[in-house]
């Protein structure tokens, strides 16, 4: 996955644009836009890399000498740097519109390096600016544009929009045996809709969502006229993939997470969203089925899920009642998952720098 970038305009976006001549060519013309410093700090903390991109009409000519541009620009950069704000690059087009150059926004020559080689996370990178040319630049780059307005979509609103978690994933898995559609919303709770055709399995999947503190919709059409094997197995694969995708870059998650008593049962679960699939499972049942679910498929479900979710999962339960033993495994997994997916900060919980 590429890096999240913010390509930010300067005049009218980071700093106020003088209405009389649209040039910040004196120190007394320099004024930061409201809330720009705390907003940029919050956006950096959320994992965005900042790039400044600006058109400076006629820079270096008699109409806009370099020596009048540099003092306010350098002071602006010093202020931002002193507050912990870092721009990876400052990209400037010095040409006039009449020059018909190839680098003036909304043309993309200045950002060519970001458009090649998968460097940029296209789905989570943005252009922020106060003019339609900034929005057109975003369109030309294939990313989203945010039109800055001090009285509307201002820095506080932009920061709220870009840092508010909305971790969602959709997986559609179709084979000769099953057709499965899964939607997962990790930052929403309640209202899950689950229909696998296996009633007790639906109830168990709902336990994961309820105790995991998230919402999911699962719709399955499987070859139940044979048995429940493919339905349960493929649901585990699709759900694990959806959970893994919804976690995204995993920045700030707890990663690890529990022990759960349920009546006479004691269920244990240890989870590491490690990127390494592995299952250790210990549970014994008296009967082949609980309701319409084969008890042997419980282990198979968690093995499939741990494989596609790329997590290390240890599950164990003891008890006397098969219904309680099965349910305790799904509940304890949900509670453990709640801990592991909870956002606790902004750093990646790995000394390797990758999960």
Swiss-Prot record:
- Read off the InterPro entries from this record: HAD-like_sf, HAD-SF_hydro_IIIA, HAD_sf, His_synth_bifunc_HisB, HisB_N, Histidinol-phos, IGPD_sf, ImidazoleglycerolP_deHydtase
Q: Which residues bind Mg(2+)?
A: 9, 11, 130
**Which pathway does the record list?**
Amino-acid biosynthesis; L-histidine biosynthesis; L-histidine from 5-phospho-alpha-D-ribose 1-diphosphate: step 6/9; Amino-acid biosynthesis; L-histidine biosynthesis; L-histidine from 5-phospho-alpha-D-ribose 1-diphosphate: step 8/9
Chain positions covered by the region annotation Imidazoleglycerol-phosphate dehydratase: 167-355
Residues at which Zn(2+) binds: 93, 95, 101, 103
State the Gene3D superfamilies in the record. Answer: HAD superfamily/HAD-like, Imidazole glycerol phosphate dehydratase, domain 1
What GO molecular function annotations does the UniProt record carry, in alphabetical order? histidinol-phosphatase activity; imidazoleglycerol-phosphate dehydratase activity; metal ion binding
Cofactor annotation: Mg(2+); Zn(2+)
The record's EC number reads 3.1.3.15, 4.2.1.19
Coiled coil regions, renumbered to chain: none
Reactions listed under catalytic activity: D-erythro-1-(imidazol-4-yl)glycerol 3-phosphate = 3-(imidazol-4-yl)-2-oxopropyl phosphate + H2O; L-histidinol phosphate + H2O = L-histidinol + phosphate
Q: Name one GO cellular component term.
A: cytoplasm
Active site annotation, chain numbering: 9 (nucleophile), 11 (proton donor)
Q: Which UniProt keywords apply?
A: Amino-acid biosynthesis, Cytoplasm, Histidine biosynthesis, Hydrolase, Lyase, Magnesium, Metal-binding, Multifunctional enzyme, Zinc
Instruction: Name the Gene Ontology biological process terms.
Output: L-histidine biosynthetic process
Region entry Histidinol-phosphatase, spans? 1-166
Cellular compartments annotated: Cytoplasm
Q: Which family, according to UniProt?
A: In the N-terminal section; belongs to the histidinol-phosphatase family.
Q: Which PANTHER family match?
A: IMIDAZOLEGLYCEROL-PHOSPHATE DEHYDRATASE (PTHR23133:SF2), IMIDAZOLEGLYCEROL-PHOSPHATE DEHYDRATASE HIS7 (PTHR23133)
Instruction: Provide the protein name.
Output: Histidine biosynthesis bifunctional protein HisB
Q: Which organism is it from?
A: Pectobacterium atrosepticum (strain SCRI 1043 / ATCC BAA-672)
Name the gene that codes for it.
hisB
């Amino acid at each position: 996955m590429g890096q999240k970038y913010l390509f930010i305009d300067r005049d009218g976006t980071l700093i106020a644009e003088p209405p009389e001549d649209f040039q910040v060519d004196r120190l007394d013309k320099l004024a930061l836009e409201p809330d720009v410093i705390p907003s940029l700090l919050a956006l950096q903390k959320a994992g965005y890399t900042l790039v400044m991109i600006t058109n400076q009409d006629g820079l270096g000519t008699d109409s806009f000498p370099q020596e009048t541009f540099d003092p306010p620009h350098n002071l602006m950069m010093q202020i931002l740097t002193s507050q912990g704000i870092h721009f990876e690059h400052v990209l400037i087009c010095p040409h006039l519109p009449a020059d018909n150059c190839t680098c003036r926004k909304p043309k993309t020559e200045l950002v060519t390096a970001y458009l090649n080689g998968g460097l940029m996370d296209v789905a989570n990178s943005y252009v922020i600016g106060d003019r339609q040319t900034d929005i057109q630049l975003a369109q030309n780059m294939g990313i989203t544009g945010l039109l800055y307005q001090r009285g509307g979509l201002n820095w506080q609103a932009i920061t709220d929009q870009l840092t508010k978690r909305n971790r969602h994933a959709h997986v559609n898995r179709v084979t000769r045996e099953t057709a499965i559609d899964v939607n997962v919303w990790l930052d929403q709770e309640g209202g899950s809709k689950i229909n696998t055709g296996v009633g007790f399995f639906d109830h168990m999947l709902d336990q994961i969502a309820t105790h995991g503190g998230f919402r999911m919709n699962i719709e399955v059409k499987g070859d139940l006229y044979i048995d429940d094997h493919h339905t349960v197995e493929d649901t585990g694969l699709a759900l694990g993939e959806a959970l893994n995708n919804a976690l995204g870059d995993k920045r700030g998650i707890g990663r690890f997470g529990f022990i759960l008593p349920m009546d006479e049962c004691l269920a244990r679960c240890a989870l590491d969203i490690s990127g390494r699939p592995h299952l250790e499972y210990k549970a014994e049942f008296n009967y082949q089925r609980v309701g319409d679910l084969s008890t042997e498929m419980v282990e198979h479900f968690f093995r499939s899920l741990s494989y596609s979710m790329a997590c290390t999962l240890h599950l164990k339960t003891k008890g006397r009642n098969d219904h309680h033993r099965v349910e305790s495994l799904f509940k304890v997994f949900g509670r453990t998952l709640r801990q592991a997916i909870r956002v606790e900060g902004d750093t990646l919980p790995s000394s390797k720098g990758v999960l």
